[in-house]
Amino acid sequence: MQSISCQRNFFTLAKWAGGAIALLAVVIPGARAGEARVPYVPTPQEVVERMLETARVGPKDYLIDLGSGDGRIVITAAKKHGARGFGVDLNPERIKESNENAHSAGVTDRVSFVQQDLFATDLSEATVITMYLLPRVNIELRPRLLELKPGTRLVSHDFDMGDWKADVNFTMDAKDKYGGAGGKSEVYFWVVPARVAGVWQWQSPVGGKPLPYELRLEQKYQTVTGSAWVGGRTATLRDARLRGADFSFSFTVEVNGAPVKHEFAGKVEGDAIIGTAALSGARIQSQAEWNARRAVRPVSDRGVPVRAARLSSSAVFN
């Protein structure tokens, strides 16, 4: 957790549920702009290991730790997983300690630490972001995190992000938590989803001739629902799965008088989805390239959740 300038015995307070939140409520009202918003409580090393394993951190990753404390997450990512990265913290003593720890670990060529507000930190280059922040800070950060490149991995110790449900979460024993008193730790993991809400259109060859398709999608974080229109017939999406930029779904609709199952899998690239389409039915068995284009975006998709806009009648396939 990021440090606060006020020195308080947080370890005792944090042993009980709500202790961290209670301390934050004391600190925030009197804090000047730019002062730290969360207290410093180190993440136990065994939790650090599980966080990095859950995010599958590797040599190609660039990790940013928000509220980096003594630097242990960034240093472990570099030393054990070959990653690069940096940590941010407001307390100059923590920055000094982090640099000393990085030097001792022999990873100063791959890590750095910066004294600055985490809300002023450029996160755009990160492939992995780690954090041990309080719930209200996570919620305040959430819109910025959703702006990151699809596929960016986020790992939080103990606190979630409200109604943005984690892709993975679990509870583990942490014997070194609370200054050695021990306790349980929660780990939450998300993959930043691509934005797919809107109306998508494409054509696919069916029975030797191109057939128009239209897809209307609604999105709440990584959860996607919607309907497909195929040659004037409609079907509800099934098995929709969005993980980062990887998007897949299926539906069954009548084509040429017989039901045909459609299975799509592709990668979202802005206003395009590029992948493959597989069709299977009594009269049709085919697989082809799939290239969908977004015809209509929602009025605003910055906040998520978002609903698909309706097409004008001139844009709808008949």
Sequence positions of predicted segments:
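Glycine-rich SAM-binding Motif I of class I
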Residues: G71-I75
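Conserved class I S-adenosyl-L-methionine
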Residues: P59-G69
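Central antiparallel beta-sheet cores of small beta-barrel/beta-sandwich binding domains
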Residues: A194-E269, I274-A288, R293, R302-N318
